[in-house]
Amino acid sequence: MNRLMIVSLLGIATVLGGCVNPPPKPNDPYYAPVLPRTPLPAAQNNGAIYQAGFEQNLYDDRKAFRVGDIITITLNEKTQASKKANSDIQKDSKTKMGLTSLFGSGMTTNNPIGGGDLSLSAEYGGSRDAKGDSQAGQSNSLTGSITVTVAEVLPNGILSVRGEKWMTLNTGNELVRIAGLVRADDIATDNTVPSTRVADARITYSGTGAFADASQPGWLDRFFLSPLWPF
């Protein structure tokens, strides 16, 4: 019996361990800065002042448009959602059946058991009522800034950018990550772009440490709130 209990506890611990979300880790290779590939040195030509890959028009600005260039994204995200639903379903039914004649003869006759007449009649009635009310609301806000690098330049000139910022505090670490697509026309002269102009944005704000752990429910609470709980 003790062996069966130990095996059961180990199985429950394994299932609950799979419900735990792994904390974010620093130095994710996907969000690492992307550096431009250094071209192989060409043969020296005396008097040459042109270097392939680093040309710039006389009237161009210094906005980012190459792999490895730096862009500052201004975070100004606000989302608000609400939903409310009401339902009320009612149904009443009533059925009444009475037989007064059969093959042309009356169905009413003297009752040999007691007084009164016999009558083959039936009556049925029923009602059902179902009501439901649900309401949900959510609001989020994120402001700040993060500097990222250009990871890829698409054939149509769209810049694929990504990057992360880790801040180490006394009680843990705070993480901000972002990845998405930016038009070169949306970049300001100081190489900044608002987050609302980032297409296909993937923004993550998370952390590790005492504050992050305190805001998470315990493993037993997660079990009761998970789909594994049968009730």
Swiss-Prot record:
Taxonomic source organism: Pseudomonas paraeruginosa (strain DSM 24068 / PA7)
Signal sequence, renumbered to the chain: 1-18
Subunit structure: The basal body constitutes a major portion of the flagellar organelle and consists of four rings (L,P,S, and M) mounted on a central rod.
Pfam families, per the entry: FlgH
Annotated GO MF terms: cytoskeletal motor activity
PANTHER family in the record: FLAGELLAR L-RING PROTEIN
Listed name of the protein: Flagellar L-ring protein
Lipid attachment, kind N-palmitoyl cysteine: 19
